[in-house]
Regions:
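A conserved FAD-binding loop/helix module that cradles the flavin
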Residues: 1-66, 150-170
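Flexible, glycine-rich terminal cap/loop adjacent to redox cofactors
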Residues: 11, 56-62, 72-170
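Active-site-adjacent helical/loop segments in soluble small-molecule enzymes
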Residues: 69
Length: 170
């Protein structure tokens, strides 16, 4: 229990992994506490989601990097994509967001994602964490229903464009 124990990595097909993060410690503590009190709940595994901010640069990641996926034996493929956050006609600060989605070339299952920008796009990594947890394929993400409003995002944004690029083989 906590960050001194192993957890099950959804990015590695449920294999035990040591991923020492506070969020993993909290969730395993909740599961242990409920089960100790007679309320049976099951942990759902982890993706190892994390983030860091260095000066103005925000970087977030979940699941496996390309190198980690290859080391784990996957046919690791990546889709790299860069796009400004908002519609280009919006005349406000509009930083670029860089995204890399890692997926298995055989099963097409999403294995990981990394994003970086001076814009705070950090909440977007949660969607990729859920995709890994639920075993979604890169193809399913390509046509994901996301809202659009020019002052917030693009009509076909970097999440979906990274996935769509993978579908097209770009």
């Amino acid at each position: 229990m906590g960050d001194c124990s192993s957890c099950y990595s959804n990015a590695k097909d449920g294999e035990p992994a040591y991923i020492a993060l506070a969020t993993n410690a909290v969730r395993s503590g909740i599961v242990a506490g409920h089960n100790a009190c007679g309320m049976a709940i099951e942990g759902v595994g982890v993706q190892g989601s994390s983030g860091i901010c260095i000066y103005d640069l925000k970087m977030v990641a979940t699941g496996l990097t390309e190198a980690a996926a290859r080391k784990a034996g996957y046919d690791a493929c990546v889709s790299d994509f860069s796009q400004v956050q908002k519609a280009t006609f919006v005349e406000t600060e509009n930083p670029e967001v860089k995204i890399c989605v890692v997926f298995d070339g055989t099963t097409r299952r999403v294995l990981g994602a990394q994003m970086a920008s001076t814009y705070d796009m950090s909440a977007g990594i949660h969607m990729f964490s859920l995709a890994i947890q639920e075993g979604l394929t890169i193809d399913r993400l390509a046509l994901l229903d996301v809202f659009f409003l020019p002052h917030f995002n693009q009509p076909y944004n970097y999440y979906t464009m990274a996935a769509y690029s993978a579908v097209l083989g770009a």
